[in-house]
């Protein structure tokens, strides 16, 4: 876990970048269904990233430090503002626990409430809910809620539930003053774009911007998947599937190239029958498939890639055990 003791904004920004990576990268502990989806961060109006320590004996006390950022009108992220978190809770918990916490502010009013007042009480005027996990953008409609705030908590490297009702995000004015060199600087100036983004937070901004890129790619991929399914349905209903014979291939049938995403730059890989070499991908994680036309597989399966784009945050077309379908490219590694 990361250090919950308050530090300067440069260190807090580095810590926030590290935490976001841990919450959004597929690893041995985080399967594809155990990461914050790109669209959650891409659509957020603000977010806070903190490390929190909780100590309990009959009454639990919580404290920690981190930063908060807001989405500016042009879509860019604001400069970071240093914050702390504090709260008390009931229960018969005994012991000390350190956790990492990501708080997604879904509504602009939540950002404004914090920026103008300097503090924000969670669970007061704003509903708080555990945020959705997984990368299935098509399930976005099912998981949408009216919650103003999503929370994600990791303890000992694993996602865990946390109750933040009554906890408050507190502006660390002195830390902001020292970092930005202005005696009277306030959170609303930082979060409303009146302060330039510091170069010390470059790594954090690169990570945040990548979520918007991933979301746009996934959104386009979902639309292309829907179009591809409709085209397959129309083709099946209008005529039987047949392939013309290739004159230079001794009468063998040649599979036509099918671009799953015609608007994306792609590289088509011929079938093994028409060329001696091919691209083979090894499945890193199991994929059960969610729609007809998906290609399910297990970890370790060898998939022949038929159509691919230049991004691994996309859907590719492949062949496995005689079945052809599309699959998420970041579930595999290309041999």
UniProtKB/Swiss-Prot annotation:
Keywords: SH3 domain
GO aspect biological process, one term: regulation of ruffle assembly
UniProt cross-references to Gene3D superfamilies, sorted A to Z: SH3 Domains
Domain of life: Eukaryota
One Pfam short name: Ysc84
Record's keyword annotation contains Nucleotide-binding: no
Segments for region (Disordered): 225-274
Ranges of Basic and acidic residues composition bias in the record: 227-237
A GO cellular component annotation in the UniProt record: ruffle membrane
Keyword Coiled coil: no
PROSITE patterns xref list: SH3
MF annotations from Gene Ontology: phosphatidylinositol binding
Family matches, as PANTHER family: SH3 DOMAIN-CONTAINING YSC84-LIKE PROTEIN 1, SH3YL1 PROTEIN
Protein's recorded name: SH3 domain-containing YSC84-like protein 1
Organism: Xenopus laevis (African clawed frog)
